[in-house]
Amino acid sequence: MKQINLITMAMICCMATASAQDSRQSSSIYLSPTTPGATLVPFALNSEGIKLPIRWGLDVAWDSEQNVRKGINHIGKDNISIMRSSFQTTYPLINDEELTASQKQKLDTRTKLIDIVGKDIDIVLNEDQEAGIVSYYVENGVANVDHWCKLINASVKWLNENYPKHKVVAISPYNEPDYSWGQGNLASFKEIAKKLKTEYPLFENIAITGGNTLNNDEALKWYNGLKPYVDWGNTHQLDGSFTNYANFFKTVANDGNYPYADELHNVGEAMIGAEYGIKMGIWWGFDSRSRGEFCRISNSGSRIGYAENRNAWTAASVYRDDTTNEIKAFIGSSERQANTSEFNFISKDRMVYFDGYGPTHEYTMSIPGGTDYQKGQTNAEKVIDVTWGEDVQPSIIKGRYRLMNKASKNVAAEYNSDNIAMVKAAKFNSTQLWDINPIDDRIGGDYSYHEITSANDGRHINVQNFSTYVGGNVMAYDGKNSSNEQWYLKYAGNGYYYLINRESNLYLMAASSSTTIGINVQQGALDTSTQAKKDLRLWKLVPEDAECETKAPAIPSGLNAKASNAAVRLEWNANTEADLAGYIVIRGDADGTNWNTIARKITEPCFIDNTCEQGKEYQYAVKAIDKSDNISRKSEIIYAMPTGDKGLIANWQFEESLADNTDNAMDAVSLNKAGFVSEHKSGEKALYLNNNYLQLPYTIANSDEITIALWTKWTNTSSGWQRLFDFGNGTDQYIFL
C-alpha cells in the first residue's frame, strides 16, 4: 500500500487562489496554474469515446469556385458526400413549366462546381431568395403555391435530365423564411410541401426540409408547422439562443426525422450540433483547418471529450482518430453572438503536449467574443494538436528564424524583389530571416496559424493570388496577414516541420533539391512516396543565432538513476558541444511501450522525475539537442522506479520559496506572485495567499493513504467554500479540506 505524508507549514490564507517561480530541474518546472473559472474539458486518451459520424458538404448556393476548392483541400473529397445548390425565383417559368435560359445557366454553373467534388454527389436544393423573388411566385405577400411547386419540379427535372449521375435528395422550398425576404408565410410553406409530396411523383423519395430559419429561436415553430410533410429538421445559427439551437436538433431526432444544418459558419456550431444529433452539415463559406480537421476526424474517430458554455455561446471537444491515433482538440463559437470565454482541456490519463506546450495534464485556451450581437465578433475557432511520444516538437515556435529546407540545406529568402527562393545561408542577412509568431486570436475565424514576416521589410510569405492549386507561386508581399499569409506549423519529427497554408491547405516546398541559388519556393500537395519528395516539403526552423547545419550532438553518456520514495533523480555526463542547447529526457514503461518526452531543452545534466508512480518500473533515456534543433540518438536505456518507502513525500517551509525540502522536488507554483510575511509558526517566514493559490505536482496525492499536516492562519470570514487543499480527478474522485 502506498502512503504519503505532506507537511505544509505557516500559511496565512485570505482567499485561496500560484506566479511560477524559478525552480530546480524537476517535473515541477512544467507546472502552470490555470485561471479559475474556465470551463473544464476532461478527456482520457484511451477511453472508448463516442462515435458521431456526420455527412459533410459544401455550398454552391454561394457559387464560388474558390470556396469549393478550399473546402476540398481542407476536408478531402472522400469526406464530402452532399452539396447544396439552389433554384431561382428570379424569373417566371416559361409556359408555367419550363425554366428560363438564365435559370438553367445558373443551375448549370452551380452543378459544374459540384462536379469538381464528384460527378455523382448528392444534392440538396434550396431557394436562392437573395437573388430576388418576382411577383409570379409571391404577390402582395401571398405565395403562389402552384407556381412555386412547378418551379421546384422543373429545377429537379432539369438536373435529372442534364446531370443524371447526381441525385437530388432533399428540397428546402423556403430559405430563412423568418427573415424579411418576402417568401410567404408558414401556411404557404406547408401547402408547398404538401403539394410536392402528394401531387408530384418525382418527390416521392425526395425529403422536405424545414424550418430553414435564420434565427434558431424560430426554427421549431417553422418545423412543427410543416408536419407531417417535413422530413429533415434544419436551422441556421445567425441568431438565437444556445439552448434553442440544441433543443431543436434534439426534437427533430426524437421525432424520428433527420437533424440537418445546411449553413454552418463555425466549428462551434458543428460540435454542438454533433452533441445534440445532427446527421448532416453543410458549410457555407469555408474557412480552413479547424473545420477541415473536424470533418475528417468526426468520421474516422471517436469523441473523447466535450464541454459547452451556453452563456458565452462557445463549445469545445476532443476527438481521437481511431486509425492514426491522432488527438485533436477543438474550440468554437457562434459567428455573431459569442462572449469571450476560456476552456481548460484536461488529459486525465497521461501528460501530453498541446500545440507543443507541455508536458502537462492541462491547458487553458481563451476564445474571443464580442460585446453584443455582431459587435466585436470574430467568428473565432481553433484546432489544437494534442501529442506525446519520444519525438515531440522541441520548443514553442515564437521568434526569429531561418527556414532551412531538408532537401538542399539552403534557406528560403526574399530574392529578386518579390520572389522567395532558395539561397545559401548567411549570417547578418535579413532577407533570409523570418519572424514567426502565432496569429492574433482576433484575426477573424480560425486562429490555428502562424504569421511569417520578413525581418528585412515586414512582408509576409504569401501564396500568390490566393492560389489553391499545386504549383502556386509563393512570394514576399504585405497582404496585412490575409489568409494566404498564414501557416500551420505541423511537426514532422526530428526537428523538422511542414508549413501548410491557411487558404490552400497546401505545403510550402522547394521546387527542386538542387543547391543552385534561386530555386523557386512554391506550394504543393503532401507527397511522401519517396524520401526525396518528402524532404522538399520539410523545413527546419533555425533560430537566428544558430548555424544552418545538420550535425547532431553526441549521444549523452553515463546515465544513472537514484530513486527516492516518490521520484527518480537522473544524472549523466555533460556534453561538450559549443552550440549545445540542452537535453531531452524520455521515459517509457518497463516493457518498452508508452514512451513520452518528460523534459525538453533542460540545460543541466540532471533531472528529477516526480511524475512517476510508486510501484511502477520505467525505462529512461536522454538525448542532446543543439541550438539548430539537431537531436542526437537516445542514450543507453536504464531502468528505475521510486522506492515507495513510507515517509515524507513533500515538505514546504515557505521560507521565501515554494520549493519542496525533500529529495522528491515536489516544488509548487503560484498563479500570481507568491507573497511571504514575517508572521509565522516556525522558521522565519510564512506564505501569504490573497486571491492566489498554489498548484502542486499532479502525483502529489496519488496514493492509497495520505496524511496531510499544515499550519494555517485563516483571516477571511466573508467567503464560503474556501479550500486549504483540493485534489481531484473529476466529480467522482476528490478530496478537499
Which residues make up each language-model segment?
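Substrate-binding cleft and catalytic face of glycoside hydrolase catalytic domains
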Residues: L40-A44, L58-L220
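Lectin-like carbohydrate-binding module/patch detector with strong preference for beta-trefoil
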Residues: D391-K551, A665, V669
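Extracytoplasmic low-complexity segments
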Residues: V542-E547, Y639-N692
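Conserved aromatic anchor
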Residues: A566-L580
